[in-house]
Amino acid sequence: MPQRLYTYPPLLRGRLLQRYKRFFADIELDSGETITAHCPNTGPMTGVCQMGNLVYVSKSDNPKRKLAYTWELIEVTDNEPTWVGVNTGLPNRVVQALLEQRCLPVLGDYGEVQREVPYGENSRIDFRLTGDRPIYVEVKNTTWTAGRLALFPDTVTTRGQKHLRELTAILLEARAVMLYFINRGDCTAFAPGDSADPTYGQLLRTGIAAGLEVYPCQFQISPEGIDFLGVAPLQL
């Protein structure tokens, strides 16, 4: 059964006119007003940033913000009409709720959910779960697909490669988990994006062989909120 882990504030609907300079998106609201919204996603948004598609934005009451609106969702129609999460600030918040509510039985028993714990080569792990054998959890957001196959990454990521090396190295003293946040509900499996970054895919496979745990988590995204659906199969 889907489990609601995040509820959006009231959102406004519109259509995407353009995205530019990575951080900006011009959107025509249903009211007819054209606004410039903050785009909280610095990546290429491969296959997702489709001009003219329906979007939802949130509005901040903070008078100090340069842009009052934040682009939250876009609808794509690759498989069927599907809402895709745009705000990359949300996945870690949702995963924190997922971990605190013990939604992943495969992780077993653990104590405290710690955030941004230093480890590796001047890095910070997204989450550290305390226990006799601590669990280090790194979260990666993905919206790129090929059919119903979710893929990560969609571009070369030296930072992501570094994280995989560090997670593999820490297996000597702890469990290590790579959690992929599939930020759309139309995918049924996950695979590394070898065509975008073959080195990342190689490092992921090396890590798995050494004991790295990989959990591609499926989520249903809607203008109402984000629901956890379960763990998708991994294709290597």
Swiss-Prot record:
Gene3D superfamilies cross-referenced by the UniProt entry: 2.40.50.580, 3.40.1350.60
Signal peptide coordinates: none
UniProt superkingdom: Bacteria
Molecular function GO terms recorded: DNA binding
NCBIfam families, per the entry: sfsA
Family: Belongs to the SfsA family.
Entry protein name: Sugar fermentation stimulation protein homolog
Highest classification ranks of the organism: Bacteria, Bacillati, Cyanobacteriota, Cyanophyceae, Synechococcales
